[in-house]
């Protein structure tokens, strides 16, 4: 999502740690007495899991309140696998919207048809900018950022998780380094954060990885230069960082930093974009909008690191703001400025030329800040 550049003295938000039940050590969970009880009396647990997997996703919070063992199953990665094998996975779109005054925001939830389902409980913690959102194991993570507390700008290391199955928020382990305006993406079930601004507003080159199994953050090899205002995407098991600025460039950086998660090392090329205001991955391609012109989008093919340009069917100002979403393998284009009056557009990359753009019936209650798609 778009991050905001902030200046001035920063300090770390240091709240008390609070870990959710779903993040406790697996061994300790299995040792509890409730794990010895059958999921459904009279049925083997494997069969019972298949029965539970047939329940519509909207009923998961109710299932999780039946008993501790049902809650444990609904939260597990295995349950997603069982639902996939049963052909019961449902794709939902989560959109963070903001009202016209820019003071209140909320997450709206829509099903695979774009029908509005509900709103999420309010995000915990103070209102922040410069944070990032990412999805891992069917859960939504809101990471770090910067906020105003008692008149001071505060760089945060907080990480909050929304469990889409239980409709609840919990606190995860803090980042090793408080940061905002950084790059973030999920690669092979792990979450990576790179660069950004730190506690005193300094530019960062450090990078960290989060392991959901252990609920821990660990440093990885740093970038060769500090970088901020950037974004990240994942392709073929690699982390691609581009856009933003660097201490070693005049203006915006076109450098593309690529992290090989298998080798644990970085390499770079000069084939990235500069100031990207919106991006989304659909299939094996990355779609971006540059801040200079919102009437076209640049499409990145990670296989050969090449770009192509696709025109947007828009009129009016070329600086009108937009944010991306994706649903059912198609790209959604939301207005990030409520007053523009733009409708939601849908782009099908697999459709024949001339038929790729359509108007979507999806309507948001405010302007779009960011969005993610979660399948469970």
UniProtKB/Swiss-Prot annotation:
Stored SMART domains: Kelch
F-box domain boundaries: 37-85
The keyword Translocase is assigned to this record: no
Claim: Repeat is one of the keywords in the record: yes
Matching InterPro entries: F-box-like_dom_sf (IPR036047), F-box_dom (IPR001810), Kelch-typ_b-propeller (IPR015915), Kelch_1 (IPR006652)
Kelch repeat feature ranges: 139-189, 190-237, 239-289, 291-335
Keyword annotations: Kelch repeat, Repeat
Domain of life: Eukaryota
Gene3D superfamilies linked to this entry: Kelch-type beta propeller (2.120.10.80)
Pfam families to which the protein is assigned, alphabetical: F-box, Kelch_KLHDC2_KLHL20_DRC7
Name this protein carries in UniProt: F-box/kelch-repeat protein At1g67480
Organism annotation: Arabidopsis thaliana
